[in-house]
Amino acid sequence: MARYLGPKLKLSRREGTDLFLKSGVRAIDTKCKIDNAPGVHGARRGRLSEYGVQLREKQKVRRMYGVLEKQFRNYYKDAARLKGNTGENLLQLLEGRLDNVVYRMGFGATRAESRQLVSHKSILVNGKVVNVPSFKVAANDVVSIREKAKQQSRIKAALEVAEQREKPTWIEVDAGKMEGTFKRLPERSDLSADINEHLIVELYSK
């Protein structure tokens, strides 16, 4: 499946919630009618079936983290094999992706931009270049901007925006050095309450 390259706001309107696909700290519902579906007339959404609700939640989370369908299913399979709550395991696996960690640290304005920074070899993990967005970051790994990339205006702009956002407690960032430490995996209480991972588990359990 190809990666979606169309308007980002359209995806958020389709899911009925801010997927944080656009840069900035202003809530997306101040920019567009989030309650209305995409399209000229922006028709209100009809009542979904149980399956439809589960599918929408899966699509919402998949798009939020910028993961393709096959990748997302594989993350679910890995989460199901781990001890503990499968839904929480799934979110932790997604949060541990390098592109997501780069975004959480504020080096990229969006996850898509952070993915690009990784792919363009602008990111170091423990001093070594890693250009795989799905690379699994471990506790106490140090993620930093490569020296020759530190003057990129988009990175500086992203850090300025990140200063206005709530800082994740599981990550420590030195904006001056453009480096951060992934202290631990986030607890469920650290993450968005707008995500209902139980619906995703129910969908894949059928």
UniProtKB/Swiss-Prot annotation:
SMART domains, A to Z: Ribosomal_S4, S4
SUPFAM superfamilies (UniProt xref): Alpha-L RNA-binding motif
Residues covered by the S4 RNA-binding domain: 96-158
One GO CC annotation: small ribosomal subunit
Keyword check for Ribosomal protein: yes
Stored Pfam families: Ribosomal_S4, S4
A biological process term (GO) from this entry: ribosomal small subunit biogenesis
Coiled-coil features, chain-numbered ranges: none
Source species, domain of life: Bacteria
Keywords: Ribonucleoprotein, Ribosomal protein, RNA-binding, rRNA-binding
InterPro entries referenced in this protein's UniProt entry, alphabetically: Ribosomal_uS4, Ribosomal_uS4_bac-type, Ribosomal_uS4_CS, Ribosomal_uS4_N, S4_RNA-bd, S4_RNA-bd_sf
CDD domains according to UniProt: S4 (cd00165)
PANTHER family (UniProt xref): 30S 40S RIBOSOMAL PROTEIN, SMALL RIBOSOMAL SUBUNIT PROTEIN US4M
Quaternary structure note: Part of the 30S ribosomal subunit. Contacts protein S5. The interaction surface between S4 and S5 is involved in control of translational fidelity.
Family per record: Belongs to the universal ribosomal protein uS4 family.
UniProt cross-references to NCBIfam families, sorted A to Z: PRK05327.1, rpsD_bact
Protein name as catalogued: Small ribosomal subunit protein uS4
Species this chain originates from: Aliivibrio fischeri (strain ATCC 700601 / ES114)
